[in-house]
Amino acid sequence: MSVELEKANAVPDYESLRAEVRRIVDEVIRPNAETTDREGRFPRENLQALAETGWNGVLIPERYGGRGLDHVAFAIAAVEVGRGCPSTSLVYVMHVGAVQTIALYGNEDQKERWLRPVGAGAIGTYSTSEKASGGHWWFNFSEASRDGEDYILNAEKSFTTSSGQADFYVFQTRTPGAQTPTDVSFFIVDGGLPGIKPGVWDALGVRGNHSGPITYDGVRVEARDKLGTEGQGREILESGVSPVYLIGLGSTWLGAAQAALEAAVDYVKATIHRDFNKRLSDYQIIRQQLAEVKVLIESLKPWQVSLAKQLDELQAAGRPQVELLLPLVEFKIHAAEVAAKAAKAALDVTGGYGYKKGIFERLFRDTRAGIVMGPSNNIAREWIGKALVGLPLELWYEGGD
């Protein structure tokens, strides 16, 4: 057996990989979390720490300077980063998703130009959502135009993680001459191009991920940075953007849920009521609330690993990853709601002290984002319900859910 084949068939040591990421989180990311939230500071230092150890290129093939790991390793990393700082984890997930989309659909020139700089700390992200289509972020009303061999982009994107901070954007808009809002194409847009105008991000939670509005005002993109072919956006969305985004998003909220539970357990074990000489952990009602959260968190872990392995299997077989769309959406729904429940329980059991500025109220605010991030849990439940009763999802038709 060749060395290359042996390496391809080798199973990564996932616990060693987890420990590697956890060290970065403990040494760099978690200590920055409070400042990231309080000041709304973009977590560039955290992303640089991940880049220096190759984790920003977790899915990038080794021949382009990445680590060439699998979706299981990525999901583990997203959990661990989410445990330390959900803002950083969301930036990380969008970055990994953007570079994976280029790895899957880019040509050799694009991979060389856009993937190699990731090892030095270049940050990518998606730029898709528009206000006019709300939570249906795959619908666009902006439209690219041609100018010779170049493209001119004019769009107002409502939510773009790392807005104004990313080195490049995987940008979605309607194809020139498109007849419907879902005839979309993708472009790789250099973050330093003239005409890119980021707005302000001042939100309830995940305040460091800079998911603000961004305007593209006559941004000129060379034809060589069209990703895939004109009109290929549906395929890219279904099998490039959505799978890695959804497994990463759910993993982020799994990590946030674990952080809330761990902090709450530490607090109730250490806090003593001197009047009755009892720890908070001596009260049955406290233990029951924490136990309920623990059970929910444990229910997510094997599901996460199973989905990540299935993504790897589909990719290895050359099959479209859209086959896992609904299971990934279901995972996203449950992970987001478990995180919100965990943060609420942590706030409940810590009482007035949890309500003060600190990790408990911060996670309470941060975890609300998971429920509304696209596809919002309301929209996602409608997809699942339609599938259950045999109705078409109609994702790509005007008026569809």
What does each model-found stretch correspond to?
Residues 30-38, 298-334, 344-355:
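C-terminal helix-coil-helix/basic helical segment that borders enzyme active sites and/or dimer interfaces
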Residues 158-163, 244-249, 370-377:
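Glycine-rich phosphate/pyrophosphate-binding beta-alpha loops
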Residues 352-401:
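Glycine-rich phosphate/cofactor-binding loops in nucleotide/flavin-utilizing enzymes
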